[in-house]
Amino acid sequence: MKIKVNDISMHVEIVGEGKPIVLLHGVGLDHTIWLEMAQLYQDQARFVLLDLRGEGQSETGNANHTLEQMAEDVLGVLNQLGLDQVLLGGHSMGGYIALAFAEKHPERLAGLALIATNAGSDSEEKKAQRYADAEAILKHGSHVLAN
């Protein structure tokens, strides 16, 4: 389904019934990373799987989006779905967004799960290394990072 949130239309999949668990994917991914697990446990919880701003089937909107803006997108989805309190889980960049959400809206959380993420944003050095790695892959193929 599509949900209008802030300045964009976001893609949201809901799987199962029960207490809501909202799961946020990492950069370059989409809601489908959670789909198999959600289907497996759909009799135990209501999984709300989003495509974050600029990923999957969601619109990009403002090209300079921030973690805080993306956390507000999550809030908008919760409000549109009438969800007062959720367990929020985030993988990689989704974890950064989940933390930003927790800082601004702790009353909306029944719990927080951070998966393969950090407690803070990447350092400038780490960002530079990530861009250098991406350039190397584009020029020489992914095998350059496997060595």
What is the predicted function of each stretch?
Residues 5-63, 67, 77:
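Conserved HGGG/HGGXW glycine-rich cap/lid loop of the alpha/beta-hydrolase fold
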Residues 68-86:
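Conserved acidic catalytic loop of the alpha/beta-hydrolase fold
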Residues 51, 87, 110-113:
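Residue in the alpha/beta-hydrolase core beta-strand immediately N-terminal to the catalytic nucleophile
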Residues 25-27, 86, 90-92:
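Conserved alpha/beta-hydrolase "nucleophile elbow" surrounding the catalytic nucleophile
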Residues 96-104, 108-145:
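Flexible "cap/lid" loop of the alpha/beta hydrolase fold
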Residues 70, 88-90, 115:
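Short beta-strand immediately N-terminal to the catalytic nucleophile in serine-hydrolase-like folds
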